[in-house]
């Protein structure tokens, strides 16, 4: 078998069906669009969600909630991911981005107590959960809110 001898499996490839190319093709005259009407015209058709004038579903259902314009979204870091750093390291948001722990700092870094911390670290972040703060201090490290 050589590269120039490769062929697709029979039946796996289909030629495009060109419509409006004469009556003998079976797809001439109306080109599969039926007779007249909105859907037969060029650019015809209704927008997605249109229900023929009936009040559409998205308008029948009630509105819920609101979007807080001042919402802060924190990049989350778990304690077990901090184990990759050597003891005595000062863990900063810049270091976390540099090492690929978080892709971006978003509105800040929040440390959560998922997993167990075995190394003594100085952790600088914008927020800490109570349990994370206790776990870092129990491991002999220090917590700094920036």
From Swiss-Prot:
Gene3D superfamilies for the chain: 3.100.10.10
Keywords: Ribonucleoprotein, Ribosomal protein, RNA-binding, rRNA-binding
PROSITE patterns from the UniProt entry: RIBOSOMAL_L15
PANTHER family according to UniProt: 50S RIBOSOMAL PROTEIN L15, LARGE RIBOSOMAL SUBUNIT PROTEIN UL15M
Positions of the UniProt region annotated as Disordered: 1-69
Known function: Binds to the 23S rRNA.
Protein name in the entry: Large ribosomal subunit protein uL15
Compositionally biased region (Basic and acidic residues): 1-18
InterPro entries xrefs: Ribosomal_uL15 (IPR030878), Ribosomal_uL15/eL18 (IPR021131), Ribosomal_uL15/eL18_sf (IPR036227), Ribosomal_uL15_bac-type (IPR005749), Ribosomal_uL15_CS (IPR001196)
Keyword Signal: no
Similarity annotation: Belongs to the universal ribosomal protein uL15 family.
GO cellular component: cytosolic large ribosomal subunit
Subunit structure: Part of the 50S ribosomal subunit.
């Amino acid at each position: 078998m050589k590269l120039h001898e490769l062929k697709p499996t029979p039946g796996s490839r289909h030629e495009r069906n060109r419509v409006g190319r004469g009556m003998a093709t079976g797809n001439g005259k109306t080109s599969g669009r039926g007779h007249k009407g909105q859907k037969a015209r060029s650019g015809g058709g209704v927008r997605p969600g249109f229900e023929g004038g009936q009040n559409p579903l998205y308008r029948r259902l009630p509105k819920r909630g609101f979007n807080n314009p001042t919402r802060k979204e924190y990049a989350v870091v778990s304690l077990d991911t901090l184990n990759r750093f050597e003891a005595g390291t000062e863990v900063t948001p810049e270091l976390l981005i540099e090492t690929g722990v978080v892709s971006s700092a978003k509105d800040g870094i929040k440390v959560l107590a998922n997993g167990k911390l075995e190394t003594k670290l100085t952790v600088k972040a914008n927020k800490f959960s109570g349990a994370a703060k206790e776990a870092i201090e129990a491991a002999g490290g220090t917590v700094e809110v920036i």
